[in-house]
Amino acid sequence: MISTCHSWHMFQIRNREMDVFYRGISVLGTCFFLLLAWKMLNWAWIKPKKLEKRLRQLGLKGNSYRLLIGDLGETSQMDKEAKSKPINFTNHIIPRIMPFLHKIIQSHGKNPFIWQGPNPAVIITDPELIKEVLTKNYTYQKPPSDDLGKLISQGVAAYDKDKWAKHRRLLNPAFHIEKLKHMLPAFHLSCSEMLKKWEKLASASAEGSFELDVWPYLQDMTSDVISRTAFGSNLEEGKNIFKLQKEILEHILQILQSFYFPGMLYLPTKRIRRMKKISKEVHSSVLNIIMKRVEAMKAGEPSNDDLLGILLDSNFKEIENDNGNNSNKNCGMSFEEVIEECKLFYFAGQETTAVLLVWTLLLLSKHPEWQMRARDEVLQIFGNSEPDFDALNHLKVITMVINEVLRLYPPGFMMSRVIHEDTKLGSLSLPGGISIFLPTIMLHHDEELWGDDAKEFKPERFSEGISKATKGQFIYFPFSGGPRICIGNNFAMLEAKMALALILQRFTFEISPSYTHAPHTLVTLQPQYGAQLILYKR
């Protein structure tokens, strides 16, 4: 009897313990759910509304926050509508390439705020404030890369603070002007091979003239330049890497033009599986090239004058100078980091120069008087000889033309930064957690800054240099500005000058009747339907 009572008592104790346990689990589950719900509510509504209130108190104007989507719905609709309608061949392109931003500035003034989903972004168009943002790069940082961006490349363009400083320091030798001189033959060879294809088309034409969409040819030429200058003797492997990188970018653009949300890359769709497979192939191919180069350098072979060789040499010297001090984690790059920099060479180097060249050819076609002046300068300096480095840097008319094209059609039409803490910008006390947008093209086209002819193609405005054209104001920054100015800007300018000199030596060109003027924004500012020209062999 006593035993039975004891057993029953123990059963009741265990039952109560289990009851307490399950109640505890239930309470913890409820607390977790409430915490998660609170975080979601704060992210989706409370925090955006608080930030909106702060921004309005600063005198900034913008649309009221819409739950989750913000201004994205209207932006997407206006972009879609704008892209469906080509425009006359004028340089008044802002309403087409960024219609929502154009509308919001007209409605709310030059410094409004917009909503990227639940995240507000303040538009800054004051030159002095933009200068401050680009100069103080430790305060105003690059936005973190999302999953799609990481598939293309990371590299110095994506890093901040000490990591950015280290990579920039190690990359600088590769883009020193003395190193660029050694890359000039690669520029010449790649462009000459493109022009041989054009000459073949001219020979096949009974009239001696032919129509050609020059845009894909320029893309192929600039990718060939990057392959040669980045990997040198590994040219074919480099070209294959570029093809894979280009395919990834095409997939990403298709995703962005349909519907993208964070975490999408975890879905097992056919496209995403293909993207991940390509990314692994690119990683493996670049690593293979790097390891072969490292082994060759260890065996005493020269590092070569290509970008990879110079980067590896710079990296090894930094590690050696550290004298094996393993405590210095900021010394040198890992192989993974070198891979990302090589991927960035492709992505940034090819796009920038290709779009600069295509808009230059189109504008010189529209303005034959400037095409003639540019050609006369090239023939006077080079004749039909191969352009050399020193003379390329003395092409005044060509430089004026390029600067004006970069003003009207900057490859990077918009820049963004984020602030993580409350920050004073001019008279604005901006709250931490917001983005800052710097619309490069809007300053480049601003009639209050450049005059009534701001949207006209007038290279003569740069006849006495950039400083004189801008009257010392910070209103021209096609390659960004401050410490983070594009590290490859001299590379791009030299390549563009070489290509233009060779094209002008061999061809005259005019706009084809089939050309449709439709600038649009992907990663850079591109011609949506190509760039059809009529070319004449000289």
Curated annotation (Swiss-Prot):
Heme binds at residue 486. PROSITE patterns: CYTOCHROME_P450. One of its GO terms (cellular component) is membrane. It is found in: Membrane. It is a multi-pass membrane protein. Its main location: membrane. Its EC number is 1.14.-.-. SUPFAM superfamilies: Cytochrome P450. Keywords: Glycoprotein, Heme, Iron, Membrane, Metal-binding, Monooxygenase, Oxidoreductase, Transmembrane, Transmembrane helix. The chain crosses the membrane at residues 25-45, 344-364. It comes from the Eukaryota. GO terms for molecular function: heme binding; iron ion binding; monooxygenase activity; oxidoreductase activity, acting on paired donors, with incorporation or reduction of molecular oxygen. The keyword tRNA processing does not apply. Glycans are attached at residues 88, 137, 325. PANTHER family: CYTOCHROME P450 72A11-RELATED, CYTOCHROME P450 FAMILY MEMBER. Belongs to the cytochrome P450 family. This is Cytochrome P450 72A225. It comes from Catharanthus roseus. The gene is CYP72A225.
